[in-house]
Amino acid sequence: MQKLIDGAQKLGINLSDKQITQFKLYYQELVSWNKKFNLTTITDYQEVQTKHFLDSLTVVLALTEEELRQPEFSIIDIGTGAGFPGIPLKVFLPQSRLVLLDSKAKKATFLQHIVEQLELSHVEVVIGRAEETAHQPLFRQNFTLVVSRAVASLPILVELALPFCHIGGKFVAQKKGEVEQEIVEASKAIDVLGGELNQVRKLELEELSDRRYLVIIDKIYPSPEKYPRRAGTPTRRPIIGVE
């Protein structure tokens, strides 16, 4: 796990022996389950350390020291897949509450298994779509941090994510490649859903060679009750425009 250890140090993170052991076990279980569940195309030991584990931990750069120390810090990972970035963030922030949301039951089975194997507490695995789950009182506007590595465009992600975020919280979207046009197109959705663009942070880590960004959006007022719209609508008719 040396690549992960070195990269994490550049983020200001010094992983403990326990955390390193958890990441090793995570890797072993990921590769083992991937043979039948098709969780990821990345299985090389070095690449998992950087492209999955380290990449997930970069979300920490979007958080303040005060936020990291909050005893009631809560995270929801939308479309988490094999648990990225949610589980690596939970390993780093063991005191946090984490919800892992994915629409696929097979992935949820793996997630529940890995949560138990890593002995992570205060973690809930939820099977469902963001469009529906965000309207449930238990989840709506109830999280400090909303994260997603999903490949959907930013206007779509904003509609799905911001309703989960409480006032004063953040949505952090992890993006690769050109993001400028996406951000322009998402400006209306950000405003409509109660957000405000905080910053777009380019990641400068040699371990992550391709262009990666954190798009950080603050939640400043409540999302209108009608959002997100019913399943599939945000994808078919995203809120696109400039405010």
Regions found by a protein language model. Give the residues of each.
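Class I SAM-dependent transferase core
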Residues: 1-76, 106-109, 113-123
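Short loop/edge segments at beta-strand edges and connector loops
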Residues: 17, 127-129, 201
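Conserved SAM/SAH cofactor-binding pocket of Class I
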Residues: 57-152, 158
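Helix-to-beta-strand junctions that scaffold the AdoMet/dcAdoMet cofactor pocket
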Residues: 93, 165-167
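Short alpha-helix immediately C-terminal to the canonical SAM-binding loop
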Residues: 107-109, 179, 183
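Short "lid" loop at the C-terminus of a central beta-strand within the Rossmann-like core
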Residues: 131, 176-180, 205
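Conserved beta-strand signature within the Rossmann-like core of class I S-adenosyl-L-methionine
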Residues: 168-178
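SAM/dcSAM-binding transferase cores
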Residues: 184-243
